[in-house]
């Protein structure tokens, strides 16, 4: 089972590698490829990810590449975590928005819209490559922000694979709530709407 990460040269690569390594047995993962368009970033963060796999799951075949076709060939799972324009573009987006007294955050408001304008064309190009080279039953997990807009664009493009838009912001809050409410996480029931950094909870219930 092959998993490909698009944007594998980012600063969070080591954390993603650790999570994948510890949970590989759940999906029968045998091969992981981290793709990035920056060989310099892969030489740093990709190699850290390699060390993680070699330490935790040395039996898994791990590689890095700047070649999207090689990365996506026969991939069963694809995770996208792109930052088109790099951190410099994020800084520019947020500062321009703040200068006009509007929200500069990268998933909502003017900053989020600017990021969507860069992210969507790049993601759709990768989607075409996924259709051409990945396994027929491949599943795409989109972490690229703004996740809601990007995932909607993928679906509306006619993408012929399953796709899920993912964000860990709501789940992080759920993990913090038990300490606030004085209960165990298993005793907590929540109702959450929205996606990404623009989600909200309507109510929390402890033990029913």
Model-derived segments and their meaning:
Residues 3-32:
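N-terminal Rossmann-like dinucleotide-binding module
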Residues 9-13, 39-41, 142-150, 169-172:
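Gly/Ser/Thr-rich loops at beta-strand to alpha-helix junctions
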Residues 61-73:
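Short acidic low-complexity segments
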